Amino acid sequence: NLADIAIVWAQTDEGIQGFVIEKGTPGFTAQEIKHKMSLRASVTSALFFDNVRVPDSSRLPNVKGLKGPLGCLTQARYGITWGPIGAAIACLSEAVDYTKERILFGRPVAATQSAQIKMAEMARRITLAQLLVLQLGRLKDAGTMQPQQVSLAKWNNCRMAIDIARECRDLLGGAGITT
């Protein structure tokens, strides 16, 4: 809905190829997907093609087969490895602020050793995730990043963010489950 172009991969007589489809091309429409359960920070659209014809000049040069779309997917997934880090940092920041203000048995929850250990462990895991994707970025810049490395980083960082979100929810007590 927002983009002026779409990069589309399609099966042709010559195999899978990429095409640039411009907004306004007859037969091409995009419909925003609303009420998503995830990826809510960005607009996602369903693309519809009804007898769309594109000129040969719209074909992506030097890209044939699945290598093109899978390469794009790997690059996109690399970007996704960073998102959970931001989510985990936001959760930890909220937990730190809350535990400093929440008084329990005459002192802030943040003053208890158990809360401090939990928050230090969360900070350690966030730092490890940051270092992981920093190294992955270095490999990407060097042209040696492998898809399986991206998969492992995404898996690690998503798991880390989920674990930290749960731990922070527990630190917030009842405030962690209300709006």
Language model features: what each stretch is:
Residues 1-30:
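A short core secondary-structure module
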